[in-house]
Amino acid sequence: MNESEIPIDIHTLKLQDWLISRRIVPKNVQQELREIHRKISNALQDMPSNEQLIKLLARTNINYYHVKEIIEILKQTEKDTKSVFGTYGSQRMKDWQEISRLYEKNATYLAETAQIFVRNVNYEIPGVRKQMARLEQQADETQKRAHDLNKPESQILADHSALLEQLGVKGDNLHAEFVQVLSGLPELYDKSLVGIANIQPGIDLYAEVSGNKQVLPILNHLVEFGNTTVYQYIHKEAPLAVEEPPIRLNLSEGNASKDDNAVAEIDFGTDDNGGTSSTVSAEIIDYGDFGSGDLPESDGGNIDWGIESAPTDAVEINFDIPVEEYGIVVEGTGMDGGTAKGDQAYTLLDSPNYRDRFLDEIYELESFLRMRIYELKQLESSSDIMFSLMDNIATHDGESIWKILVSVEKIIQQTSDKQTQHLFQLKHSPKYANMLATKLQQMTKAVEKLRATREALKQLTIELREQRQDLNPVLEELIAQTRTLQSHIEKDISKRYKNRVVNLMGGVN
């Protein structure tokens, strides 16, 4: 094989050292390059107006091959200054020809071309590719983050809708809607006690087993009389009038409408017996003054009553007649003459104190019934008959007790459901309305913030992908430039070694 047929393989990382070791370029080539770049900067200050030049000079880095192109363009623009000897009188042409000679001296152009080629292969192209990959990754992550925000938004919207549903409001005007739903609270109480008569056998069984006939007094009262006022439960008689404390919804200005900032005083329109209240307190009725001292003495005037009176003897009037026998409630007895006020005006399920006692009793009854069912199951599975558990089995077997327990659990569920709890707190806690309104407002703001964030992330994703696309022509131009430089280097070295094939290893892909 001839020497000319043996290829020359040069690794890109060792290209510059190879050129110096073969004494193709000097070691101090950097000083010559700095001088050349200084002259290029000065020459660029005086350039003719030409579209080709403008396009060429738009490149950031001017190398030897650009200088050769500039000279070819100047041959056209400066042809008027050309002498018969082939020289140019134009200073522009002289400057660029001098730059070209400096490049060709000591093969400085080859050293610079090798530097640019190595820099592009090792840094510029990988850097652009990494930037593109990073932008693509950021776009994917941003898109995923925007998609992940759908889940918390849906959860908050579901919680918001659930809370509004529990409260029975739409959320448009909370103050007015709170007032409206609170008016239906007595109906909720009545609905929760529809089947309370079914637990009477359980109460009787508990009283018989415990030996205490006065056990569970509130449940007994509810079964017999229903959800009456606390006044009736305490005094064993219905009040003449009910003056329930006004309800105060302390909603802040941001949570209430302009016309609803006043204190809400709600009249539920029901008395303790479930009917429409039409009683009026005796304190506000003016009966007039009919004392005997103010009546004029008369013999009855000229009024003929149509009654024939017979002469009678003087009769002594007995004022000690028991008015109770005639169903008369005397003013001054009971509480302000039979008017339920304050906490006693609330119903048993509506009173904070008595509601807790009711829940204690209903849970106590539930525990007793569960224990009773457990004991009956143990009795059935045990070979030794426990005589202490034989009482009432004939009338209350496991199935009958289970039916009572189902009724008890239904009452517990209905009296302790979310809507009843919210409305109860809303009525008796002045700050609860504002707390609910604030919570709803925070949910709404959270959803708005999530939506704004998602839109911002979507916009950022679009921008990142656009930046990624903008780098495509940059990368293509770098690759094209690098391949051109590689071709120049291989051809130049090949000429120096009898046109042997030169391969730059590790070049651009």
From Swiss-Prot:
Assigned GO CC terms: cytoplasm; endomembrane system; nucleus
InterPro entries linked to this entry: CDK5RAP3
Major localization listed first in the record, in broad terms: nucleus
Subcellular compartments: Nucleus; Cytoplasm
Domain of life: Eukaryota
An example Gene Ontology biological process: regulation of cyclin-dependent protein serine/threonine kinase activity
Keywords tagged on the record: Cytoplasm, Nucleus, Ubl conjugation pathway
Entry annotated with the keyword Secreted: no
Known role: Substrate adapter of E3 ligase complexes mediating ufmylation, the covalent attachment of the ubiquitin-like modifier UFM1 to substrate proteins, and which is involved in various processes, such as ribosome recycling and reticulophagy (also called ER-phagy).
PANTHER family: CDK5 REGULATORY SUBUNIT-ASSOCIATED PROTEIN 3
Family the entry assigns: Belongs to the CDK5RAP3 family.
Protein name, as recorded: CDK5RAP3 protein homolog
